[in-house]
Amino acid sequence: MPRSNRNDNFIDKSFTVMADLIVKLLPINARSKEAYVYYRDGLSAQNDGDYAEALENYDEALKLETDPTDRGETLKNMAIIYMSNGEEERAIETYQKALDENPKQPSCLKNMGLIFEKWGRIAEESGQQDDADRWFDQAADVWTQAVRLNPGGYLDIENWLKSTGRSNVDVYF
């Protein structure tokens, strides 16, 4: 039984019913509709904290989905799960795959930067300043791209870039 049929929350169930109706009415092929069902069930499982089920659904959605924007969104959600589970290298790889599908996803860049910045802090705390600087520079590179894609959307990142001296003036224009 699809996860959406097991949902007891009235609002979620209502949203699911409406989304299903819209998908049925849209002039898209059956394969894309099936991919959407897997994606939707993956989102539901992810929101419930059932990451294994979410990843299974996302994998199935990726097997069916051909649209790069939708594939990128699915991969981004998978990367978020890997990041939540502490699988940071796998998260980075999956965020990169998401960006390969759809390069206009600033949240992927933002999250990659969070991982690089964390690794930089860990290296710095371990007295490995050269490694820390490399990680911080990588964080700055992806965060600069994120800010360019979403100006004003990541004020905390803009402040970090400025306060660490890693800001490019052209980012803000």
UniProtKB/Swiss-Prot annotation:
InterPro entries: PSI_Ycf3_assembly (IPR022818), TPR-like_helical_dom_sf (IPR011990), TPR_rpt (IPR019734), Ycf3/AcsC/BcsC/TPR_MFPF (IPR051685). It comes from the Bacteria. Keywords: Membrane, Photosynthesis, Repeat, Thylakoid, TPR repeat. TPR repeats lie at residues 35-68, 72-105, 120-153. One of its GO terms (cellular component) is plasma membrane-derived thylakoid membrane. It is found in: Cellular thylakoid membrane. One of its GO terms (biological process) is photosynthesis. It is a peripheral membrane protein. Essential for the assembly of the photosystem I (PSI) complex. May act as a chaperone-like factor to guide the assembly of the PSI subunits. Belongs to the Ycf3 family. This is Photosystem I assembly protein Ycf3. The lineage of its organism: Bacteria, Bacillati, Cyanobacteriota, Cyanophyceae, Synechococcales. The gene is ycf3.
